[in-house]
Amino acid sequence: MKLFVLLCVFVLCLASQEKQQDREIPVLCPVCTSLVGKLIDLVLGGAVDKVTDYLETLCAKADGLVETLCTKIVSYGIDKLIEKILEGGSAKLICGLIHAC
């Protein structure tokens, strides 16, 4: 019986977490496109080496949505992100790839 109750609590926690993530995406998307737009400007302006520094500075101070976004970007990979920018990927496309839109 205890195992059943524990399993039910676990399933409810997972369901609650998924709903929270679904609610975050509409709010997270514009924040992401704005941030990725800044990264696109850096890369296309020839400051590829500044992308990592910019993200490290921002993410060190981040909380809430920006912290979530930083986690998504780091999980995706900064090198992959730069590669997508150089391939002509838009901010909306890149944010979709990192599951922020």
From Swiss-Prot:
Function as written in the Swiss-Prot or TrEMBL entry: Forms pores in the cell membrane of host cells. Has antibacterial activity against M.luteus, no activity against E.coli. Implicated in the cytolytic activity of the parasite.
Organism name: Entamoeba histolytica (strain ATCC 30459 / HM-1:IMSS / ABRM)
Keywords for the protein's UniProt record, in alphabetical order: Antibiotic, Antimicrobial, Disulfide bond, Signal
Stated name of the protein: Pore-forming peptide amoebapore C
Boundaries of every Saposin B-type domain copy: 25-101
GO biological process: defense response to bacterium
Location(s), subcellular: Cytoplasmic granule
Keyword Lipid metabolism: no
Signal sequence residues: 1-24
Coiled coil, from the record: none
Major localisation: cytoplasm
SUBUNIT field: Monomer. Homodimer. Hexamer; formed during insertion in the membrane.
Disulfide cysteine pairs (residue numbers): C29-C101, C32-C95, C59-C70
InterPro entries per record: SapB_2, Saposin-like, SaposinB_dom
Organism domain of life: Eukaryota
